[in-house]
Curated annotation (Swiss-Prot):
Function of the molecule: Catalyzes the conversion of acetate into acetyl-CoA (AcCoA), an essential intermediate at the junction of anabolic and catabolic pathways. AcsA undergoes a two-step reaction. In the first half reaction, AcsA combines acetate with ATP to form acetyl-adenylate (AcAMP) intermediate. In the second half reaction, it can then transfer the acetyl group from AcAMP to the sulfhydryl group of CoA, forming the product AcCoA.
Protein name per Swiss-Prot or TrEMBL: Acetyl-coenzyme A synthetase
GO MF annotation: an example: acetate-CoA ligase activity
PTM text: Acetylated. Deacetylation by the SIR2-homolog deacetylase activates the enzyme.
Gene label: acsA
Source species of the chain: Thermus thermophilus (strain ATCC BAA-163 / DSM 7039 / HB27)
Substrates-to-products reaction catalysed: acetate + ATP + CoA = acetyl-CoA + AMP + diphosphate
Length: 648
């Protein structure tokens, strides 16, 4: 039976305050249920109503045409995302409202009002046009977390160019692969970026990448660090010089709803990166609405999502979602612990952040650094917290709730993917009770199903399987850029006719979904299928443990043995006695079947630059492989892998 066993029990339930509930957009479980049923029964009526809150140059003739894997949304409708994110607000009192509040790692501040941003975006749209960029051309953006990244994205959408943002932490090789795949005409980069007090050599990486990626005709360089950088006359241009010469009026291109908006690459475990393609109308409508309801956005909110624009979270919930809602969005350039581990909390207090959205990996780091750091700050402006990027273990959830939210801020634990475009499963903060470790319920219009290996629905509560989506939703990816076969093979071949997320999940008796991690992060131990996330959660619940990553290694008797890589909190030291204590602890929390066969202490875990643990590398290390295979372009610190190999 291809079913995931779920073994970690977390029974506590938390409710939003009456005061929060009264003010929320969706105020009760009953209201959620009524709207959800309508969104499933009449998706065209529901999404047509939502899309009507935005501006369309020409109305659609049909809201939804066709079905998975190739639905079309808002057919015949014409709109422009930058118009909806900027022009719509500039015509109202929001004209002089802060759109982007930015802080650089060294401490500089910039505030761009909606009017400022509108003018800058139009200027840069004209710059792109003068460089020969036309509708449908691809533009690669390789920048630090600075306002110019958002300006460049919005300028592309204004003229119908397709942007491909590449995370500034990626290597020259990873950048070259992504430029070549998209056949980008223009590259936008900076002389460098600041990270932990050092300088990231973006221009140097760009020059290296362009030796291999020859489609690029022009490189626009933002002066960020003032470093001397190599220069290719005729090809390279300073951002500020081009902007000085550009007019600040550029009419938005009228875009068909299904025309391409952006490509964003996700790393496959092997082979070349996948270029996920999102289109204009459906993506715009869905991120607008999810941002509004999941974060319960109000006009007075100061909203901060800590993601980098190089990831989908940065696209949907740093730039597009907040600006479509006329919100104030905070951008921060640097590391959470630079110069000290309270940098995030300083920013929260300084700007009066009300809604805060970050990753579980960051929360576990905050736990490791101790309560003293957030304890130095008031944090009383916060009213709502969120998590994104991976399942959050109950221990980290409870710490976040009590230490950062002071027990008064609801937490939205959001499940979604690059491919889904927007949040798919979550609690709505005024409507739902929260269960630590459970993402929550499907967002409007989202119809999940948990299937076993034989494509049968898993009916029993708390029995796991593959998380699939059975109906189209507006912001889903439309294809893999240049590779339609890979699109079908990757997402629609495992369970015919439905979208397969690659994640395992279970649904409890109340309809709450718990995400069990990637299906390929499932262990088969003596015929039992165990989700790695549950064993990791049990380990992290031990007071000595800061972080844990669990993988399987081949075992002649059990099929797979359980290997746990563990980092300890400050004040705890590795010992054989602690190893035994941790093994016994897991056996007690989950059951003897989940007792790790081996525990390896380490000072750090190998992570991608977005903070996800690279379990694939840990599997290779656990199996004793001397050479690390597969794509490691997203690995943040290679020395971690070397130290783990030496300690093997």
């Amino acid at each position: 039976m291809d079913r995931l066993e779920s073994v970690l029990k977390e029974e506590r339930v938390f409710y939003p305050s009456e005061e929060f509930r009264k003010q929320a957009h969706i105020k009760s479980e009953e209201e959620y249920q009524r709207l959800y049923e309508e969104s499933v029964r009449d998706p065209e009526g529901f999404w047509g109503r939502v899309a009507s809150e935005l501006h369309w140059f020409e109305p659609w003739r049909k809201v939804l045409e066709g079905d998975l894997p190739h639905p079309k949304w808002f057919v015949g409708g014409k709109t422009n995302l930058s118009y909806n994110a900027l022009d719509r607000h500039v015509k109202t009192w929001r004209r002089n409202k802060a759109a982007i509040v930015w802080e650089g790692e060294p401490g500089e501040e910039r505030v761009l009002t909606y009017h400022d941003l509108w003018r800058e975006v139009q200027r840069f749209a004209n710059v792109l046009k003068r460089l020969g960029v036309k509708k449908g051309d691809r533009v690669t953006i390789y920048l630090p977390m600075i306002p110019e990244a958002a300006i460049a994205m919005l300028a592309c959408t204004r003229i119908g160019a397709v942007h491909s943002v590449v995370f500034g932490g990626f290597s020259a090789g990873a950048l070259a692969d992504r430029i070549k795949d998209a056949e980008a005409k223009v590259l936008i980069t900076a002389d460098g970026g600041f990270r932990r007090g050092g300088i990231v050599p973006l221009k140097q990486n760009a020059d290296e990448a362009l030796k291999d990626a020859t489609s690029v005709e022009h490189v626009v360089v933002v002066r960020r660090t003032g470093e001397e950088v190599p220069w290719t006359p005729g090809r390279d241009h300073w951002w500020h010089e081009l902007m000085e010469a550009a007019p600040d009026r550029c009419d938005p291109e009228s875009m068909e709803a299904e025309e391409p908006l952006f490509i964003l690459y996700t790393s496959g475990s092997t082979g070349k990166p996948k270029g996920v393609l999102h289109t204009t109308g459906g993506y715009m409508t869905y991120v607008y609405y999810t941002t509004k309801l999941v974060f319960d956005l109000k006009d007075e909110d100061v909203y901060w999502c800590t993601a980098d624009v190089g990831w989908i979270t940065g696209h949907s919930y740093v730039v597009y979602g907040p600006l479509l809602n006329g919100a104030t969005t905070v951008m921060y350039e640097g590391a959470p612990n630079w110069p000290e581990p309270d940098r995030f909390w300083r920013i929260v207090d300084k700007y009066g952040v009300t809604v805060f959205y970050t990753a579980p990996t960051a929360i576990r780091s905050f736990m490791k650094w101790g309560e003293g750091w957030p304890g130095k700050h008031r944090l009383d402006s916060l009213r709502l917290l969120g998590t994104v990027g991976e399942p959050i273990n109950p221990e980290a959830w409870l710490w976040y709730y009590h230490v950062i939210g002071k027990g008064r801020c609801p937490i939205v634990d959001t499940w979604w993917q690059t491919e889904t475009g927007g949040i798919m499963i979550t609690t709505l903060p005024g409507a739902h009770a929260m269960k630590p470790g459970h993402a929550g319920k499907p967002f409007f219009g989202v119809v999940p199903e948990i299937l076993d290996g034989e494509h049968r629905p898993v009916e029993n509560p708390d029995e796991g399987g593959h998380l699939c989506i059975t109906r189209p939703w507006p912001s889903m990816l439309r294809t893999v850029w240049g590779d339609p076969e890979r699109f079908l093979q990757q997402y629609f071949s495992q369970h015919p006719g439905v979208y397969f997320s690659g994640d395992g999940a279970k649904r409890d008796k109340d309809g709450y979904y718990m995400i069990l991690g990637r299906v390929d992060d499932v262990l088969n131990v003596a015929g039992h299928r165990l989700g790695t996330m549950e064993i990791e959660s049990a380990l992290v619940a031990h007071p000595a443990v800061a972080e844990a990553a669990v993988v399987g290694r081949p075992d002649p008797v059990k099929g797979e043995a359980i290997v746990a890589f563990v980092t300890l909190k400050e004040g705890h030291t590795p010992s054989d006695a602690l190893k035994e204590e941790l093994r016994a602890h897991v056996a007690k929390v989950i059951g003897p079947i989940a007792r790790p066969d081996e525990i390896r202490f380490t000072d750090a875990l190998p992570k991608t630059r977005s903070g996800k643990i690279m379990r694939r590398l840990l599997r290779q290390i656990a199996a004793g492989e001397k050479e690390i295979k597969g794509d490691t372009s997203t690995l943040e610190d290679r020395s971690v892998v070397e130290r783990l190999k030496e300690g093997a």
